[in-house]
Structures are given as structure tokens and as C-alpha cells.
Amino acid sequence: MALPVSLLMALVVLSCHSSCSLGCDLPHTHSLGNTRVLMLLGQMRRISPFSCLKDRNDFGFPQEVFDGNQFRKPQAISAVHETIQQIFHLFSTDGSSAAWDESLLDKLYTGLYQQLTELEACLSQEVGVEETPLMNEDSLLAVRRYFQRIALYLQEKKYSPCAWEIVRAEIMRSFSSSTNLPQS
């Protein structure tokens, strides 16, 4: 299946490094971007979540990765960046394009891409200021395993409408958990 043009453009731009540096007022811009993405995810709802209660699943969101006091700003930004990349990948699958309205999906890609761009610019500034490891390997693994469980769930449920609705609601929940980044 051919990828939507906006997805291809986002992938091309993602592969290029930003030559300009954005101001790192991340908590404000990140919050606004999250609000836009959450609104889009809300608009993507096609069926009532109540009709899918039998399909509920605990994907084991690694909340400890996003607890603000545990990490310094670069590690928190890196964790959120990995999460957004995984969400982008999840909604870029063939099964996803068949499940959602293409216009809303394109807007979601754009919103996620904007988030990634802001995080990358901010991360490069933060790492330049202090030489700290970007993300604890255990945290990175926890985020990736979480999304692997979601992908496996979708596969086991044969990408059914209810499975996608459960995943959409889960992504909204986990995405909103990552909105509060440390200020320093």
C-alpha cells in the first residue's frame, strides 16, 4: 500500500537535521503540541469505547519513565521523544491507515512530527549545555516494550475496529501522561 504523501514528507524531513536552533521553551510548546495531538486522537474515535470493554487490555505503561523527579530534563525529553516516535510508527502501519480517516491521520502525523522537531531542537541544546546521557537504557527498553505489547495486541486482534479503539484510548492516556516535563 502506498504511503500518504504527508507521511513521506514527514519521514524525509525527519531524516534531515534542523540547521536552525529553536528556543528551548519546551514545557509551553510541548504542552500546546500535546493538546493538538490529543484533540486529534479524540476526533479519530469511530466507535464507542463502551462497545469494546471486552477487548480492554493493560499494556503496562511505564509511568516511572515519565516521573518528573526521577530524570533531568535531557533524559525526560529523550523519553518523550522515543514515545512520540513509537506513536508515529504505530499509526504509520498499513493496518492503521485502513482503520482511520486519512485526513485526521495526516493531521496526526503532522502534529507528531512537529512535536519531534521541537524535542530534537531542545534536546540538542540541552545536551550541548551539559554532557549527560540522553536516556537510561532501561527506560528506553521499557518504552519500546510497551509499544511492542500494543503492536502485538493489534496483531492478535487482527487490527479489529475495537482493538484500534482500545489502542487509541491507551495512546491518549499515555500521551497525556508525558505532558509534564521538568523545568530545569
Swiss-Prot record:
Disulfide bonds: 24-122, 52-162
Top-rank lineage group of the source organism: Eukaryota
InterPro entries to which the protein is assigned, alphabetical: 4_helix_cytokine-like_core, Interferon_alpha/beta/delta
Chief location bin: secreted
Statement: the UniProt record of this protein carries the keyword Secreted: yes
Location within or outside the cell: Secreted
GO biological process, one term: humoral immune response
GO molecular function, one term: type I interferon receptor binding
A GO CC term assigned to this protein in UniProt: extracellular space
Signal peptide location: 1-23
Keywords carried by this UniProt record: Antiviral defense, Cytokine, Disulfide bond, Secreted, Signal
Biological function: Produced by macrophages, IFN-alpha have antiviral activities. Interferon stimulates the production of two enzymes: a protein kinase and an oligoadenylate synthetase.
Family membership: Belongs to the alpha/beta interferon family.
Protein name: Interferon alpha-3
Phylogenetic lineage: Eukaryota, Metazoa, Chordata, Craniata, Vertebrata
